[in-house]
């Protein structure tokens, strides 16, 4: 269904993407979230936003409409550990409560927008570039749902900012931890990882080089052992035994039939 919708937009002449300063905004219902789950949610974005910025290729032209999380808000929500939504709301608007009734509140222009949550009961993810590629759109939705699931199911998510010198490997591990495992999510992982650099299989690339060298050496040794086994000389006793004719070494009936047919054909 999603693929058909995207194709219909293309056929109708739809255009989108960073060059048009257009983004994909995904809204997820959070009416049943607890204050702790909202805290988990914003902590996930705060800790992984550097990864997300690179993986999602957030356009510089769109950054005025999609900032990273407000560090002061993240610090306050984790220090005060609010027990109800009104406390979170006060922290979000920094006490300027009249903003909650403004559609274009400045607080909405962040990667994870809680302004829409306080207004309509659903939060908004604003980091994605616009796309008319069904696979990319699907990967955006799947990632949003996986983050939502982590916020709801995990007891606590740390706001500590993740760093890595091998972004491709670290982001892939995070996707697997979110549950994007197996063939079902293979295309999603491919789209989300395609802009990142690094060794996807090894945390430290030099470990991968060493492992591949060891594997190559092992295979060469196995091939050499197989060649030596094929070229192993046969002992004299076994040669003599092979050359001694067996008693009653008469041809079988089927062998005789074959010889008779050949003789008849040659006549």
Regions picked out by a protein language model, each given a short descriptive name:
Residues 20-24, 28:
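Short, conserved phosphate-binding/catalytic loop or strand-edge motifs used
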Residues 1-18, 31-267:
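C-terminal accessory/tail domains of diverse enzymes
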């Amino acid at each position: 269904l999603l693929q058909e919708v995207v194709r219909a937009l293309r056929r109708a002449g739809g255009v989108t993407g960073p060059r048009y300063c257009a983004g994909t905004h995904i809204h997820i219902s959070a009416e049943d979230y607890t204050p702790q789950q909202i805290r988990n949610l914003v902590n996930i974005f705060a800790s992984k936003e550097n990864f997300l910025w690179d993986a999602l290729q957030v356009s510089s032209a769109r950054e005025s409409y999609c900032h990273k999380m407000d560090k002061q808000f993240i610090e306050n929500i984790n220090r005060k550990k609010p027990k109800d939504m009104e406390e979170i709301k006060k922290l979000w608007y920094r006490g300027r409560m009249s903003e909650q009734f403004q559609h274009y509140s400045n607080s909405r222009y962040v990667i994870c927008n809680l302004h829409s949550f306080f207004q309509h009961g659903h939060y908004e993810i604003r980091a994605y570039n616009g796309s008319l590629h069904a696979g990319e759109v699907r990967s955006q939705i799947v990632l949003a749902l996986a983050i939502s699931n982590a916020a709801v199911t995990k007891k606590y998510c740390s706001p500590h900012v993740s760093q890595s010198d091998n972004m491709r490997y670290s982001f892939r591990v995070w996707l697997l931890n979110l549950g994007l495992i197996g063939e079902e999510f293979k295309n999603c992982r491919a789209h989300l990882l395609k802009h990142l650099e690094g060794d996807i299989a090894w945390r430290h690339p030099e470990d991968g080089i060493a492992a591949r060298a060891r594997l190559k050496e092992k295979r060469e040794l196995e091939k050499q052992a197989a060649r030596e086994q094929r070229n192993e000389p046969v002992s004299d006793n076994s040669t003599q035994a092979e050359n001694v004719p067996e008693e009653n070494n008469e041809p079988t009936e089927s062998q005789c039939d074959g010889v008779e047919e050949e003789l008849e054909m040659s006549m």
